Amino acid sequence: MYVYKRDGRKEPVQFDKITARISRLCYGLDPKHIDAVKVTQRIISGVYEGVTTIELDNLAAETCAYMTTVHPDYATLAARIAISNLHKQTTKQFSKVVEDLYRYVNAATGKPAPMISDDVYNIVMENKDKLNSAIVYDRDFQYSYFGFKTLERSYLLRINGQVAERPQHLIMRVALGIHGRDIEAALETYNLMSLKYFTHASPTLFNAGTPKPQMSSCFLVAMKEDSIEGIYDTLKECALISKTAGGIGLHIHNIRSTGSYIAGTNGTSNGLIPMIRVFNNTARYVDQGGNKRPGAFALYLEPWHADIFDFIDIRKNHGKEEIRARDLFPALWIPDLFMKRVEENGTWTLFSPTSAPGLSDCYGDEFEALYTRYEKEGRGKTIKAQKLWYSILEAQTETGTPFVVYKDACNRKSNQKNLGVIKSSNLCCEIVEYSAPDETAVCNLASVALPAFIETSEDGKTSTYNFKKLHEIAKVVTRNLNRVIDRNYYPVEEARKSNMRHRPIALGVQGLADTFMLLRLPFDSEEARLLNIQIFETIYHASMEASCELAQKDGPYETFQGSPASQGILQFDMWDQKPYGMWDWDTLRKDIMKHGVRNSLTMAPMPTASTSQILGYNECFEPVTSNMYSRRVLSGEFQVVNPYLLRDLVDLGIWDEGMKQYLITQNGSIQGLPNVPQELKDLYKTVWEISQKTIINMAADRSVYIDQSHSLNLFLRAPTMGKLTSMHFYGWKKGLKTGMYYLRTQAASAAIQFTIDQKIADQATENVADISNLKRPSYMPSSASYAASDFVPAAVTANATIPSLDSSSEASREASPAPTGSHSLTKGMAELNVQESKVEVPEVPAPTKNEEKAAPIVDDEETEFDIYNSKVIACAIDNPEACEMCSG
């Protein structure tokens, strides 16, 4: 059997030669479990006559990827083979690659089609020796196989369909695209990104250094006006933004409802849905950067709009096709008044914005006064508030949407409140910025890789978290994002105007779950909750400090005066809480009041779906969804096991084919294994096995340091109206801005697992674990304070205990989510004297025949116990086991 070499030569397939090549790439891997000969045997079985060496390397990489379930080091080996293959096919010198991309001529048209901007090309040519020598190609081998395949599929630039860039080339291109002629800053960014301390968001990786460097991820668009001209001008703006890889949040509160009078034609309006379908088709047609990602729009609507029932159902799988728009994402911009009416089982009135103008232009007490005035004047149609609430929950259970964002919390706790009323969030519910017909809000994103700051002692017995290093890196990311604002290509002038005036940025995180697992902290432990607080306090302080330093050099952003920050009010002040106290907030506050900040907003932890795949971590701040899952690439589907769990099971001596099949049957859960120590069961709980109350508590803890919001998904294995209501009201009373991004659920029934041998799977419970082999470093919590000596930490000291996971402030029990007084994070449940009778919510009345949109029929007993029960909503009862939230 013959193989064709890269130079066209033909030679016999040699077993020993393949084995030697694989062995050379096994450095640093576990020799007990990585067998180069076994890999070669599997490769040979798939070889065919006339295979090329490139195809042979691809086959070898895929073979190792399939063996990842044997040991996680096989994933590393797969990546090394794939990257070694890429290195053989691509030019090494960065400057030569840039030149090839710059001088690219389109084969179909014969015309020049440069993929690198003139500016970046000239910078590279002028500094090519310095840049070429700065690149460390060995860092390419630190990517996982699936991380590399993600880069290869969508991020690395191609010439005539062939990948031309290496991962290190991409990172240097991004660094130069951001910093231009500031070579030292570019090299700092290159080194930190290539060492995987942080990554910029996908649009920045796609477009930095290209002729049209649109590096922003998020755009918040305002409907220009309720007219044909206004609607179609807005549609064009959305198309231009989507064309350049931007995700869109669009508020449509001001569009008249179905049946409203149209003065210009003396007719009546068709309402929101036909217009929404036009936007739906635009999202389908205009993808993000040539099939890299589909176009994506989220539409925001307040629940008083008369078309609200049709709006929340647009993604449902059944119903009339002409009232569906399944490529858009509905989102609710909910005022506190609606939540109060649901809680009280009160009425709710629906209006057309033409008959009740101004409701979207105010919030808080002003909104309530205007809304109740319109109600008294009889301008709308009144329904039971819980009827609409039920329809919202029904849609969420079926489709995962609509998203829930709280209007009053977003406006009340924003540093942009001096600009006007904020009317929407973005596609992923983490960006909260002011937008107007002449200003499209923009945000540039980057995420810090949290596991990169774990340090293990020389003897391997203890591990610590380096907050000082995290602080330094977060400041670098802040400076980078601020630079992106100036170097960015803006698809529409409204976006340029807004971004230059207010200069918001968004720092996020990825790998929080990985950090907890590496430090051996269960996600729902008190230690993990404290670390969560410390991490976000550190990043917020770093971002504000860096922004203040930039303001001292370049001046504050244009609209700084009049903002809360200009008065010394920071995000935790708006929550009426004091910071944990690791950092010197008093000095920073004084500096901000004196010099200003360069950026109006700095924090917004976002979903990191693609970039966390690249770096090999779990998404953003979420727990793991499963300890075993499938990963699809072009060549097929691969089973992937949580690498931390897999190493532990291998060391315990109980990982085998039976254990693998057991995990598949249990959807990645190890909770039913009698031979696994309890500490591992606690450590490797999936999100389905963690109380959602814990998730919401941790979200509220970090929100004190998040001046925008964050993309908070909620997870319910089997959602019911009671559980959903309980979660929504708990999050609202905690003061969250984003109550829910997606609702994630599990299928009601599992597919038949034809490939599983149940007898083999059952043997997994019989293996005897050798706990003596499980030696891992223990976490040493940080007691360091980086505050000035005269700064007294508010709230808690480094050695203080933090609240139990069931604790909450008395303010969070009230009907209004606004905090009523300063309170310490150490206040526990025992200190509270909460009366169950504070909140009484009557049961949902049975739907009557003449109601326009009857609720689905449910069992009476389930309705009485499950829906809007006062105990479920208040969550303040003596017997936690009787509460849906407390019992998990």
UniProtKB/Swiss-Prot annotation:
EC number: 1.17.4.1
Substrates-to-products reaction catalysed: a 2'-deoxyribonucleoside 5'-diphosphate + [thioredoxin]-disulfide + H2O = a ribonucleoside 5'-diphosphate + [thioredoxin]-dithiol
Annotated InterPro entries: ATP-cone_dom, NrdE_NrdA_C, RNR_lg_C, RNR_lsu_N, RNR_R1-su_N, Rrm1
Temperature-related behavior of activity: Optimum temperature is 30 degrees Celsius.
Cross-link (Glycyl lysine isopeptide (Lys-Gly) (interchain with G-Cter in ubiquitin)): K387, K853
Location of this chain's protein in the cell: Cytoplasm
GO biological process, any: deoxyribonucleotide biosynthetic process
UniProt binding sites for GDP: S202, S217, N426, E430, T608, A609, S610, T611
This protein's UniProt keywords: Allosteric enzyme, ATP-binding, Cytoplasm, Deoxyribonucleotide synthesis, Disulfide bond, Isopeptide bond, Nucleotide-binding, Oxidoreductase, Phosphoprotein, Ubl conjugation
Domain ATP-cone: residue ranges: 1-92
Positions of post-translational Phosphoserine modification: S227, S816, S837, S887
Binding annotation for ATP: K5, R6, E11, P12, V13, Q14, F15, D16, K17, T53, D57
Effect ascribed to mutating C428A: Completely abolishes reductase activity
Activation/inhibition comment: Under complex allosteric control mediated by deoxynucleoside triphosphates and ATP binding to separate specificity and activation sites on the R1 subunit. The type of nucleotide bound at the specificity site determines substrate preference. It seems probable that ATP makes the enzyme reduce CDP and UDP, dGTP favors ADP reduction and dTTP favors GDP reduction. Stimulated by ATP and inhibited by dATP binding to the activity site. Inhibited by SML1.
Ranges of Low complexity composition bias in the record: 804-819
Remarks, miscellaneous: Two distinct regulatory sites have been defined: the specificity site, which controls substrate specificity, and the activity site which regulates overall catalytic activity. A substrate-binding catalytic site, located on R1, is formed only in the presence of the second subunit R2. Present with 293000 molecules/cell in log phase SD medium.
Family: Belongs to the ribonucleoside diphosphate reductase large chain family.
UniProt function note: Provides the precursors necessary for DNA synthesis. Catalyzes the biosynthesis of deoxyribonucleotides from the corresponding ribonucleotides.
Protein name, per record: Ribonucleoside-diphosphate reductase large chain 1
Species the sequence originates in: Saccharomyces cerevisiae (strain ATCC 204508 / S288c) (Baker's yeast)
